[in-house]
Amino acid sequence: MLRYYLKLGVLSIRANWALSGLMVAAIAIGIGACMTIVTVRHVMADNPIEHKNDQLFHVQLDNWNPNDPYEEPNEPPEQVTYLDSTALLEAGRAHRQVISFKSDRVVQPEGDGVLPFQQEVRSTSADFFAMFDVPFKYGSGWDADADRAEERVTVLSASMNEQLFGAEDSTGRTLMMNNEQFRVVGVLDQWHPVPTFYDLNNNPFDGPEEIYTPFSLAVTGEWGSSGNNSCWKPPEEGGYEGYLASECIWIQMWVELTDEANKEAYAQFLDDYVMEQKELGRFPRELNNRLSTPADWMVNREVVDETVSVLLALAVLFLVVCLLNTIGLLLAKVIRRGNDISLRRALGASKSELFKQYIVEAGMIGVTGGLAGIAMTWLGLRGIENVFADYDFISYLVTMDWEMVGLAVLLAIVSALGAALYPTWQACRVSPASTLRIQ
């Protein structure tokens, strides 16, 4: 019977191509507007490390002003001090631990006529690549011994390697930054976590850094942080050493804990550590340590802007308006086909058969509207990309994956079927006797 209903649906759409076209257009425009915003929000709220979400934790310690919290109502600082990050790293109580910050350096490419350029560099401890499942194309990262020895090694992204060395295996070659030599030990494969969950400061949609160096080397070289730096009181001593010994927060810390028992043990370790520091005159506030999963941390830092949520609500309302128009068009179509419906009822067609026929026809219109809606969504995303072309990160936010394509088609079908329920019910209520008597 499905083939028969599909055939009747095709004939009905052809016989009323204008009304059918308007319904497809209404659904496509509504789906396009809605899915454009849904896609942007989907990318913004994506968790690039979801498969390890229950194992990775962002560390927060509340070393802030005793009189005022870092953020209301009682949020601890989003970063940690050099003193605490290095002490916790050295303790090694987690399966893996990462401390890192970003810094601006001047890259000096090989060859005459190639101008130096400024580049943001991620200075991090050795576990960064293993903890965050960073893929390598050539070589590997450095180890903890290289961290302790402050070896001048570096890892390049695939795009930076192509820019500097023509995409060949550059392991063992030399990179010059700020007149200092670094030996390339690894080149990443394609890796673009968006948002950059491991550091949500500044703009989390700029994408990951292109160059990575050991944390200890950056500190010894007195590299400044190009990320957020916050202090609740000035350093007691001047210079870089005074900055390292201060209560200023500028380092992101993550730990990998394999199960709930390890998480509880590490949380207790943090409490014990802070209590020890209190005896030394630090941490004037009450215990307020936090361990947040990547998903929880992104919610905490409000990665999805409130404006996007408002736009999503407006887009859904616009889709509802389009569906109301579709309902009106379907009702008009039912009224125009009243004689045909009455004749079929008089010849023995049951209400259930009519219902199935019109639902199948509505589904066909929904599929067509969904496919057209995908095209409208693509146009909407390209429009956003063109309007905000000056922002380098915008290309990451306007990417439509297969999940969104499937959602668009499913939403179109469900919307069309939902819009068809009332007109179909009205069609089934048509009295064949009264209609044919009038004719």
Question: Across the structure, where does each feature detected by a protein language model lie?
Answer:
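Membrane-helix entry/capping segments
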Residues: 3-4, 274-314, 336, 381-406
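Structured, solvent-exposed hinge/loop segments at the ends of secondary-structure elements
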Residues: 38-164, 168, 177-182, 196, ...
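Mid-to-C-terminal secondary-structure elements
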Residues: 126-141, 152-300
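Internal alpha-helical transmembrane segments of multipass membrane proteins
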Residues: 309-329, 376
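A short amphipathic helical element positioned immediately N-terminal to and/or at the very start
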Residues: 2-14, 84, 88
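Transmembrane alpha-helical interface segments in multi-pass membrane proteins
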Residues: 324, 331, 339-385, 406-407, ...
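Short, strongly hydrophobic transmembrane alpha-helices
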Residues: 16-50
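C-terminal membrane-exit region of the final transmembrane helix in multipass inner-membrane proteins
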Residues: 404-439
